From Swiss-Prot:
Function: Binds to the VCAM-1 5'-UTR region.
Family the UniProt entry places it in: Belongs to the fetuin family.
GO molecular function list: RNA binding
Name assigned to this protein: RNA-binding protein
Keywords linked to the UniProt accession: RNA-binding
Length: 13
């Protein structure tokens, strides 16, 4: 999981 606050919104990594 990347350190993006919207990682789950863009791509469920």
């Amino acid at each position: 999981i990347p350190l993006d606050p919207v990682a789950g919104y863009k791509e469920p990594a």
